[in-house]
Amino acid sequence: MSVPDATVVKAFLLDLQNRICAGLEQLDGQASFAADSWTRTEGGGGTSRVLTQGAVFEQAGVNFSHVTGAAMPASATAHRPELAGRSFEAMGVSLVIHPKNPYIPTTHANVRFFIAHKDGADPVWWFGGGFDLTPYYPFEEDVREWHQTAKNLCLPFGDDVYPKYKKWCDEYFFLPHRNETRGVGGLFFDDLNQAGFDKSFDFMQAVGNGFLTAYAPIVERRKETPYGERERDFQLYRRGRYVEFNLVYDRGTLFGLQTGGRTESILMSMPPLVRWQYAYTPEAGSPEAELYDNYLKPRDWV
């Protein structure tokens, strides 16, 4: 079994952050990312990079963090109690993109590595991550292409990989109190270590590198689509689901807050503007109704 090497993972993550920011700046064509580096008193730090008020992106945040601690927090040991009390290192790149145009979907991606140490014992480590898409208006072409890209990057690792992580994504990004998925899913994986370090790292890299391949064509296709107040209002209303999920259910958000992480970076995923409306119901036969009827539940897209 190959030996875990946090140094090579960190180098990949820093390079990935640079490449994704460059790609998003190119797609936007106007705004650029501002970098904000920070250190954590308990150990570690990171760099948050944020683009605001661009031509295409209202807000895009791409965060790198590498934090260390003497004891693992409750959120990380809830499903692995044997790890309680171990020291840990956690590193990752996490991003959320909120476009201006309601016809461009919001998206989220994350790749991460976790390693826990204990004197006299082998380190316990795993990779996690994925990417998911949250459209406001239904375009089957976009969703099928998104999932095809996800499936293609999984195929070298086995025929069962895409169906497994696609299903996990549908289950993870689900709002029980709304009885709907957050969007149309993608990939979600966690606790990945069974194949050994090298192969597990290869898969995490494939997911990180595949994100822009999946997202950029959708942005290019939709960024010039005209929209009005109705579409903007619906976009802001649906953004509320993002806030609800991240603050109530998301493991990464809860982990960051429980470990004394940097609040500005953790809440960077929040949309800059959002609205709630009491007892909203989409008009029958409308594109908004189609989103509810056909897109906010698990489907086999490819």
Swiss-Prot record:
Residues 242-277 are annotated as: Important for dimerization. Keywords: Cytoplasm, Heme biosynthesis, Metal-binding, Oxidoreductase, Porphyrin biosynthesis. It is an enzyme of class 1 (oxidoreductase). Pfam families: Coprogen_oxidas. It catalyses: coproporphyrinogen III + O2 + 2 H(+) = protoporphyrinogen IX + 2 CO2 + 2 H2O. Substrate binds at residues 94, 110-112, 260-262. PROSITE patterns: COPROGEN_OXIDASE (PS01021). InterPro entries: Coprogen_oxidase_aer, Coprogen_oxidase_aer_sf, Coprogen_oxidase_CS. HAMAP family: Coprogen_oxidas. Involved in the heme biosynthesis. Catalyzes the aerobic oxidative decarboxylation of propionate groups of rings A and B of coproporphyrinogen-III to yield the vinyl groups in protoporphyrinogen-IX. This is Oxygen-dependent coproporphyrinogen-III oxidase. The lineage of its organism: Bacteria, Pseudomonadati, Pseudomonadota, Gammaproteobacteria, Alteromonadales. The gene is hemF.
